[in-house]
Each structure stands twice: as structure tokens, then as C-alpha cells.
């Protein structure tokens, strides 16, 4: 073989974008199997990918064959990336990826010319017999199929590559060229074409709607090409023993960029029986309209996430039980998906920012209506509680809920004695307790309320949970630096116990 390109994961000049693109190339080579582009050799190892061809095959023709085998269209004119391993019957997942790519890598019509009238695909949740119709723009071709904007396949080069090639926005979404075009070697630009394969794209539906981000491109930091190629193709599978969270359209709809990244990382590692991970973490690139450019989608913010967090189990529980998506109708009568709960978004953002997992939880229950909705979050809050590792958090929640249980018992006795509505008594007491927690402004005030709440529940006797962790609890609750955390934990303890009640009433259905 006269022409040979070796892309090494250890290349010191590579950024996380290069490594993600190399992961996309690795997954594509794996998908080729023995059906490689004619005249092209391909080799995949843990730390490199090798491409080669003979002198009798011009470089431009070799590239055309590589692109033709890597970037395709389905019969329904949706983008097809063989490297991601999406099956023909997964139209809803392909729809999410198609719309995501068109909104990020290929946001300009000239990069994906196609039909003017949108086509429709039915999307339904696991619980729905009939779904809603979601739309997409069918494309006749897209930029990656012919390396559009790079200059690699210009006729004037007569079969050869240029000395330098351009890096258009379709290759690296959000890339800004400024006065001068971004350029690199032909080999590097060819590699970056596979960034769209190596990344995962999610559709963002922020809870506050103040954040105008619409998409999230998750860029993995890859350390093992073979493992990553296997993992990214495994995500598209629908196994019965291993739960996947991002292998459907609805699974690609999340509240925040951090939630998207953690959901993708969990899916990457699911079912991997080896001790070695394929990635060390990722970048979550949120994209949307920004104030200084209303004409196109730009990067609105970027956050780096690690592969592991001490309390990642709490997010996993929130993601599994509260990470569902609801389908509503837009003003045009089309389907529109939104997250059913804001909790996974909040926990993911906290973990990524190295905040306490429960930080700002009070923003989710500060309004009475939000609080009432939260208490019916099925088994999700209970599962989160069981996943907590921190001893201080466990002690506070355990003590609060023991006191609340005794308070309920006293209210039950009162209801029986006086012929009152037990449910109404609980509702009033729960709301009174929520307001009392929210009104406290200092650690001392909250600690005093907490101790009085516990004492009232036992008519002056010490709670068993407090006796067991007396020193730990005392040290924690009187520390002013713990005030926000303490307040959020009390609110979480209240609503997660309320979740126990609602599940009991519903027969424990989750």
C-alpha cells in the first residue's frame, strides 16, 4: 500500500474533539467489518486507526469511497451514520439524531438541501398505544458525503488533496472562522468529518425556558477506540436485561446539557463487563440562539464532566425513575416532547458543578403547585434516597422522616378520635412544614426549628435516629456553611416521604 494514514489516539496535538472524531472513525471502521470501501484497507486497534490504499487509486477517489461508506441517507431521506449502529426499525431514534445533526452540524440549508415540506414520523412512549406525529426535513444530500466546504474534492486538484484543507462549521459545530478561515492538513480535516459520528446529540428542553439552548452535543474524551466503538453501537440495542436511556427519540430529550452528558456516559458503560472504560469523561456543548447572533445556532455554554462522581448513584436513580419524557402537542398540532420531571436536570447540573447533589432543590418545591406535583413522583425520590452515600445526608433525612412518621401517627390518632379527615390533616401539616422550612434564613434558626420539630413528634423524648447520630447531627446543623444544604435536605426528606405515601396509596406502582 502506497498511501497510508495512521490516526493515533496518543497524538499530542489532538484535542478532545480530535479524539471524539477518532472514536467516530473507529466505530465506522468496525461497522464496515469485511465490507470495506473498495480498494481501501482499514485497521482498528485500541489506540489507532489505519487507512491505506494503492497508488493506482487517486487520493480523492479513495476519500469519495470512504465517505460513501460512512455517511448515507435512508430511503426516507434521513441521515444514516453506519458507525452508530442504528437499526432500520429505530425510526424514532434516527429522527432525534437527524434533527439534532441538522440543528448543529448542518444548520444551514446549503449543507443539507432537501424538501421544503416536512415529513412526519410517529413517536410514542412505552405506555402509549397511539403516538403523536413529529416532523423532520428530508434531505437529498448532506455536507459530509462530499466533504463540502473543505476543498478536499475540488476538481482542479486532479485526484490529489490540497496542501491545506478548510474546517467549515459543518465539521465542528459552532466553530467561528473570523477574518481567516480555519485550516488544517487534509488528513486532520478528514478525521474531523467523523466528529458527528463520535458525538451524541440530545434535544434540550430547559425547565426555566430562560435558557435558549436547543441542542447538546456530547463530546466524549476517548481512551480506548475498540471499547468505544463497541459501546456506541451497543447503545442503539434494546436489550431486555440492560436498560438503555438514550436509544429512543424520547430518551434523547432532556432538560439540561449536564443531564444529557451523564445519561450518555451511563449508557456507554452499561453492559460493559470489562473493568476498563472507553472514556474518561466528556464535554457537554449546549447550542442555541444567543443575544449577539439571532440568525444561527451557536454554542451557548460548554461544561466538562468527569466519568465518575461520588454521588453518581443518585443521578442514576433520578434518571431511571424520573427521567421519562411527556409528549404534548405544539400550537401547530405537532408532537413535542418535554421532560416529565426537573429532578434529573437539577442533580446532573449540581454534580457537574461540584455542588452538593441537592443544591437548589428548594427551587423545585418553593411553589405550592410544584410541591404538590413533586410528591407524586412515584418511586423516584425514594430510589434517590436509597442511593445516598454521604453519612451526614443520611442522618438528616433519617431523623426528619422518623419525626414525620411520628407526626403522621399522631394526626392519625387525632383523626380517629375526633372523626376528622386524615388526608386533609396530613395535607395541611405538610404544607405548614414546607413553609416553616422555607421561612428560615440562618443555620441557627433552621436548627432550632428542626430540633423542635423532632421533639414535638416524640412529645419531648429523643428520636432514635438522633440518638444514634447525635454528635454528627449537632455538628452539621449548627454550621452556618451547611445552611443551604440542610434546608434542601429537609425539603427533600419531606417530599420523598410524601412519595412513600403516594406509592402506598397506589399499591406501590412505579
Task: Give the location of each predicted region.
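Long, contiguous all-alpha helical interaction modules
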Residues: 1-112, 116, 125-128, 277-510
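A broad "ordered helical/assembly scaffold" signature
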Residues: 166, 193, 396-400
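Long Lys/Arg-rich low-complexity intrinsically disordered regions in nucleic-acid-associated proteins
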Residues: 88, 92-146, 153, 168-173, ...
Amino acid at each position: 500500500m502506497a498511501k497510508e494514514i495512521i490516526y493515533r489516539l496518543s497524538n499530542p496535538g489532538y484535542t478532545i474533539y480530535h479524539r471524539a472524531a477518532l472514536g467516530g472513525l473507529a466505530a465506522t471502521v468496525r461497522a464496515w467489518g469485511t465490507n470495506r470501501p473498495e480498494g481501501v484497507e482499514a485497521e482498528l486497534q485500541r489506540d489507532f486507526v489505519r487507512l491505506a490504499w494503492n497508488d493506482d487509486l487517486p487520493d480523492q477517489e479513495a476519500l469519495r469511497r470512504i465517505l460513501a461508506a460512512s455517511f448515507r441517507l435512508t430511503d426516507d431521506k434521513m441521515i444514516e451514520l453506519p458507525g452508530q449502529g442504528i437499526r432500520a426499525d429505530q425510526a424514532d431514534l434516527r429522527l432525534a439524531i437527524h434533527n439534532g445533526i441538522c440543528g448543529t452540524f448542518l444548520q444551514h440549508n446549503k449543507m443539507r438541501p432537501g424538501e421544503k415540506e416536512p415529513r412526519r414520523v410517529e413517536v410514542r412512549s412505552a405506555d402509549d398505544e397511539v403516538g403523536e406525529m413529529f416532523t423532520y426535513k428530508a434531505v437529498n444530500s448532506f455536507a459530509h458525503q462530499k466533504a463540502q466546504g473543505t476543498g478536499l474534492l475540488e476538481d482542479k486538484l486532479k485526484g490529489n488533496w490540497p496542501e491545506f484543507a478548510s474546517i467549515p462549521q459543518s465539521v465542528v459545530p459552532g466553530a467561528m472562522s473570523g477574518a481567516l478561515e480555519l485550516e488544517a492538513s487534509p488528513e486532520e480535516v478528514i478525521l474531523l468529518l467523523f466528529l458527528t459520528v463520535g458525538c451524541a446529540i440530545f434535544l434540550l428542553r430547559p425547565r426555566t425556558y430562560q435558557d435558549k439552548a436547543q441542542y447538546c452535543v456530547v463530546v466524549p474524551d476517548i481512551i480506548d477506540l475498540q471499547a468505544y466503538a463497541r459501546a456506541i453501537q451497543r447503545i442503539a440495542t434494546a436489550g431486555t436485561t440492560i436498560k438503555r436511556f438514550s436509544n429512543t427519540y424520547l430518551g434523547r430529550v432532556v432538560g439540561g446539557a449536564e443531564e444529557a452528558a451523564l445519561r450518555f456516559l451511563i449508557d456507554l458503560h452499561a453492559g460493559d463487563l470489562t473493568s476498563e472504560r472507553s472514556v474518561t469523561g466528556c464535554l457537554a456543548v449546549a447550542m442555541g440562539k444567543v443575544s449577539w447572533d439571532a440568525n444561527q445556532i451557536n454554542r451557548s455554554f460548554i461544561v466538562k464532566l468527569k466519568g465518575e462522581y461520588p454521588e453518581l448513584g443518585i443521578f442514576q436513580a433520578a434518571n431511571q425513575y424520573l427521567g421519562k419524557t411527556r409528549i404534548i402537542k405544539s400550537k401547530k398540532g405537532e408532537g413535542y416532547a418535554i421532560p416529565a420531571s426537573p429532578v434529573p436536570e437539577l442533580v446532573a447540573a449540581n454534580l457537574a458543578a461540584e455542588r452538593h447533589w441537592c443544591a437548589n432543590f428548594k427551587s423545585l418545591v418553593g411553589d405550592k403547585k410544584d410541591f404538590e406535583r413533586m410528591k407524586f413522583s412515584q418511586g423516584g425520590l425514594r430510589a434517590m434516597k436509597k442511593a445516598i452515600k454521604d453519612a451526614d445526608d443520611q442522618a438528616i433525612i433519617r431523623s426528619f422522616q422518623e419525626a414525620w412518621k411520628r407526626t403522621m401517627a399522631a394526626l392519625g390518632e387525632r383523626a380517629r378520635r375526633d372523626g376528622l379527615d386524615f388526608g386533609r390533616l396530613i395535607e395541611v401539616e405538610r404544607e405548614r412544614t414546607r413553609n416553616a422550612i422555607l421561612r428560615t434564613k440562618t443555620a441557627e434558626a433552621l436548627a432550632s426549628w428542626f430540633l423542635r420539630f423532632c421533639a414535638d413528634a416524640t412529645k419531648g423524648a429523643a428520636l432514635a435516629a438522633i440518638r444514634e447520630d447525635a454528635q454528627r447531627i449537632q455538628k452539621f446543623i449548627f454550621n452556618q456553611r451547611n445552611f443551604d444544604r440542610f434546608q434542601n435536605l429537609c425539603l427533600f426528606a419531606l417530599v420523598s416521604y410524601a412519595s412513600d405515601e403516594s406509592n402506598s396509596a397506589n399499591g406501590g406502582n412505579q
